[in-house]
C-alpha cells in the first residue's frame, strides 16, 4: 500500500498532477482544524487552500484522506461543517483525534473530547458518505490506513475505531 501525506502545494494544479501521477493508493492532506481556528493553529495554511487541494486531487481520481485534531476550542457545529466541507471536496477518508499540546509554545488544549463524542462524530461522518472514518482520542493521521484502503475498495472492513 502506498500512502502519501502532502502539503497543500498552494493548490497548484501542476504540482498536484505530479503527486496524482505517482498513483498512490491514498493521498492525504490534513485540514487539521475548523475554519475559524485555522489562522491561530495553522499560521502558514489556509482552510480554503486545503479544501481546494483535496478537491483537485479527488477530481484527478485520487482517493483522498484528511484529518482533524479536536479539543482546540471548536464547536460541534464547526466540526460538522468541516466534515461537510471535506465531503463536498471529494474526501473519502477522514480521521479525528484528540489534539495533544506537544510543548508549552504550542496552541493550548481547550478540551479533552470524550470517547462517546468521538463515536458520535464517526457515525455522523459515515452518514455524510465518507467511506471510512477513524475517530477516537488516540487516532492519528495515518491510523489504520490499510483498513481505510480496504473500505474504499469496498472490501470487508471494520470501521469501528
Regions found by a protein language model. Give the residues of each.
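Short, small-residue-biased leader/transition segments that mark boundaries at the very start
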Residues: 1-2
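Structural motif
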Residues: 5-7, 67
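Active-site-adjacent beta->alpha loops and helix N-cap segments on the catalytic face
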Residues: 12, 36-37, 41-52
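Auxiliary Fe-S-binding modules of radical SAM enzymes
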Residues: 21-23, 48-65, 70-161
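Short, flexible active-site loops
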Residues: 33-42, 62-69
Amino acid at each position: 500500500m502506498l500512502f502519501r501525506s502532502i502539503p497543500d502545494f498552494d493548490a497548484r494544479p501542476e504540482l498536484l498532477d505530479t503527486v496524482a501521477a505517482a498513483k498512490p493508493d491514498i493521498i492525504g492532506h490534513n485540514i487539521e482544524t475548523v475554519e475559524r481556528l485555522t489562522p491561530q493553529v495553522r499560521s502558514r495554511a489556509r482552510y480554503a487552500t486545503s479544501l481546494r487541494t483535496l478537491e483537485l486531487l479527488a477530481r484527478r481520481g485520487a482517493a483522498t484522506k484528511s484529518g482533524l485534531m479536536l479539543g482546540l476550542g471548536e464547536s460541534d457545529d464547526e466540526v460538522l461543517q468541516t466534515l461537510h466541507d471535506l465531503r463536498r471536496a471529494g474526501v473519502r477518508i477522514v480521521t479525528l483525534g484528540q489534539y495533544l499540546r506537544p510543548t508549552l509554545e504550542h496552541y493550548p488544549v481547550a478540551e479533552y473530547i470524550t470517547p462517546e463524542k468521538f463515536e458520535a462524530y464517526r457515525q455522523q461522518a459515515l452518514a455524510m458518505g465518507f467511506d471510512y472514518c477513524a475517530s477516537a482520542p488516540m487516532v492519528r493521521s495515518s491510523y489504520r490506513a490499510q483498513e481505510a484502503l480496504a473500505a474504499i475498495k469496498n472490501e470487508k472492513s471494520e470501521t469501528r475505531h
